[in-house]
């Protein structure tokens, strides 16, 4: 906090008077200045040679008598008081205690001094520029009038008896401070003009800003505690992008980590041509871009996600999770409506929502939709009728089945080649109707009596899985779509397409990059 900050501003400061005691030890001889005809007893002025030490000011009593004699000799006035009486000087503290010559606030001329006097007299109420109770040390502050008391000029050094610069000098210009010492060192011993102080350059109505150290000391500790580093740092999440870069969950591919090898130079030290095609993973070189696009990199491997219940393979873990939801036990419905035959409308709705009965996988974008087969037609093996949609064919087959059941005639047998394709050979596993159903029901957590098996073609319900498969082999042999890459069979073309896209993508897909003919722009 700057000095003088807590000074009461209600009281207006008035010029301070100082009383100077006379000679207590006896009568002292008055010293007259040479300009007034008296003898000079002050120490000699410093010469051009080096000064051995700082000037020692005379005792206070001698300085008081010397200043009094100088004032009386230069200005006409009443006769001086006798030496026995105490001389009182009102408003002239500098006349009694002259300041040293190195004060930076010394005026240059009397006009400047008068102007400065009237200008500074309006600032008597400023708590910064004035002090309420000056100490004896403050009386030695360099002022404009005291500089000429013991100077080399015969007319009093060009100073005045004004105590303005003494009373209203800023605090940093006092004796013993670092600022005054620095100003004295900068001014030098020469008689050149003094450096202007900081207070003279400041507008009269402004209060000086405190230094940085004072501002830091005046700042409350709460603000210091709330530094910029006081905020809690947010938790930095460590994100690992390695899996996102090296794996493809849609295609089921992953890039293996290869050995770190230094780049090998070519034999002969020749530089590599610009037209060379090199795989960035396995570093194999190819002569043309087509061979580079068609090659199978050894670092790209297929990631398979196999279902533990039914051994189905998926390329994406999300598809496997969606598939495994079908293996969870369902709430068993009431026993009365458990094996109740479904109507054709309900069968259509179930087929539309769930897809094929034996293939409930997530449909792939590359599969063929159920709106039509690859040829766009579905043919009935009973009457050779053709339908554009599989749902229409199922309705038609259901009508055939109901008509045959009403007549009591046995259903027609499927062709011989279809029977050979349907029945497994001796090396293949034959599904057991009774034991297999029990094991499957035990694995899935379902009871055989509580679940009905629906025919995916005609919608007929059966109490067991074996009965459903026998029905499919005998009646709907033409509607079975076997996989040409594995012994799996499906009852719909979209189901077979989804199976091939998921389980056999490498055999089905071909590299078409850089092989598509460029079409002219429209």
Curated annotation (Swiss-Prot):
Zinc finger annotations (C2H2-type) as residue ranges: 277-297, 305-327, 378-400, 453-476, 481-504
Domain of life assignment: Eukaryota
Compartment annotation: Nucleus
Pfam families: zf-C2H2 (PF00096)
GO molecular function: chromatin DNA binding; DNA-binding transcription factor activity; DNA-binding transcription repressor activity, RNA polymerase II-specific; RNA polymerase II cis-regulatory region sequence-specific DNA binding; zinc ion binding
Skewed-composition ranges (Pro residues): 43-61
The UniProt record lists the keyword Nucleotide-binding: no
GO biological process, one term: noradrenergic neuron development
InterPro entries per record: INSM1/2, Znf_C2H2_sf, Znf_C2H2_type
Chain intervals with Low complexity compositional bias: 66-75, 212-228
Residue ranges, compositional bias (Basic and acidic residues): 339-351
Alphabetic keyword roster: Cell cycle, Developmental protein, Differentiation, DNA-binding, Metal-binding, Neurogenesis, Nucleus, Repeat, Repressor, Transcription, Transcription regulation, Zinc, Zinc-finger
Chain residue ranges for the region called Necessary for interaction with CCND1: 43-57
Region spans: SNAG domain: 1-20
Chief location bin: nucleus
Its job: Sequence-specific DNA-binding transcriptional regulator that plays a key role in neurogenesis and neuroendocrine cell differentiation during embryonic and/or fetal development. Binds to the consensus sequence 5'-[TG][TC][TC][TT][GA]GGG[CG]A-3' in target promoters. Acts as a transcriptional repressor of NEUROD1 and INS expression via its interaction with cyclin CCND1 in a cell cycle-independent manner. Negatively regulates skeletal muscle-specific gene expression in endocrine cells of the pituitary by inhibiting the Notch signaling pathway.
Subunit and partners: Interacts (via the N-terminal region) with CCND1 (via cyclin N-terminal domain); the interaction competes with the binding of CCND1 to CDK4 during cell cycle progression and increases its transcriptional repressor activity. Interacts with HDAC3; the interaction increases its transcriptional repressor activity. Interacts (via the SNAG domain) with HDAC1. Interacts (via the SNAG domain) with HDAC2. Interacts (via the SNAG domain) with KDM1A. Interacts (via the SNAG domain) with RCOR1. Interacts with SORBS1.
The protein's name: Insulinoma-associated protein 1
Organism the protein comes from: Bos taurus (Bovine)
Species lineage: Eukaryota, Metazoa, Chordata, Craniata, Vertebrata
């Amino acid at each position: 906090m700057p000095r003088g900050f807590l000074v009461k501003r209600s009281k207006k400061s008035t010029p301070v008077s100082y009383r100077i005691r006379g000679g207590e030890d006896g009568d002292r001889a008055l010293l007259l200045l040479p300009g007034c005809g008296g003898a000079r007893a002050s120490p000699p002025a410093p010469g051009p040679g080096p000064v051995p030490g700082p000037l020692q000011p005379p005792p206070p009593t001698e300085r008081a008598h010397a200043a009094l004699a100088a004032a009386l000799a230069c200005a006409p006035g009443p006769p001086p008081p006798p030496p026995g009486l105490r001389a009182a000087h009102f408003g002239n503290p500098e006349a009694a205690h002259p300041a040293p010559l190195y004060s930076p606030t010394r005026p240059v001329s009397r006009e400047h001094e008068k102007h400065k006097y009237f200008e500074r007299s309006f600032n008597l109420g400023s708590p910064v520029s004035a002090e309420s109770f000056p100490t004896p040390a403050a009386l030695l502050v360099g002022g404009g009038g005291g500089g000429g008391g013991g100077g080399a000029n015969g007319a009093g050094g060009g100073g005045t008896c004004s105590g303005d610069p003494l009373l209203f000098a800023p605090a940093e210009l006092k004796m013993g401070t670092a600022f005054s010492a620095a100003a004295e060192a900068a001014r030098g011993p020469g008689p050149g003009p003094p450096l202007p102080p900081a207070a003279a350059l400041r507008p009269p109505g402004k209060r000086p800003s405190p230094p940085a150290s004072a501002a830091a000391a005046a700042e409350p500790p709460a603000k210091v505690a709330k530094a910029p580093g006081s905020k809690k740092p947010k938790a930095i999440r460590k994100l690992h992008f390695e899996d996102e870069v090296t794996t493809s969950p849609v295609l089921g591919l992953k890039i293996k980590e290869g050995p770190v090898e230094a780049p090998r130079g070519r034999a002969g030290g020749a530089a590599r041509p610009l037209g060379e095609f090199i795989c960035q993973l396995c570093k194999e070189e190819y002569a043309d871009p087509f061979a580079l696009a068609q090659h199978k990199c050894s670092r790209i491997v297929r990631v398979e996600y196999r279902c533990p219940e039914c051994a189905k393979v998926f390329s994406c873990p999300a598809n496997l999770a969606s598939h495994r939801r079908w293996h969870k036990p369902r709430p068993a419905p009431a026993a009365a409506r458990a094996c109740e035959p479904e109507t054709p409308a309900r069968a259509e709705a179930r087929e539309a929502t769930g897809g094929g009965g034996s293939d409930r996988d997530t449909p792939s974008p590359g599969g063929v939709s159920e709106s039509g087969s690859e040829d766009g037609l579905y043919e009935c093996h009973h009457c050779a009728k053709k339908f554009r949609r599989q749902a229409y064919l199922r309705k038609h087959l259901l009508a055939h089945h109901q008509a045959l059941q009403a007549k009591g005639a046995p259903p027609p047998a499927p062709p011989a080649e279809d029977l050979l394709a349907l029945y497994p050979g001796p090396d293949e596993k034959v599904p057991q109707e009774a034991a297999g159903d029990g094991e499957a029901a035990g694995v899935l957590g379902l009871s055989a009596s509580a679940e009905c098996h629906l025919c995916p073609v005609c919608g007929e319900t059966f109490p067991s899985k074996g009965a459903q498969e026998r029905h499919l082999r005998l009646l709907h042999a033409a509607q079975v779509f076997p996989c040409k890459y594995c012994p799996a069979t499906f009852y719909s073309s979209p189901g077979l397409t989804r199976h091939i896209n998921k389980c056999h993508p490498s055999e089905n897909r071909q590299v078409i990059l850089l092989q598509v003919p460029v079409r002219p722009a429209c």
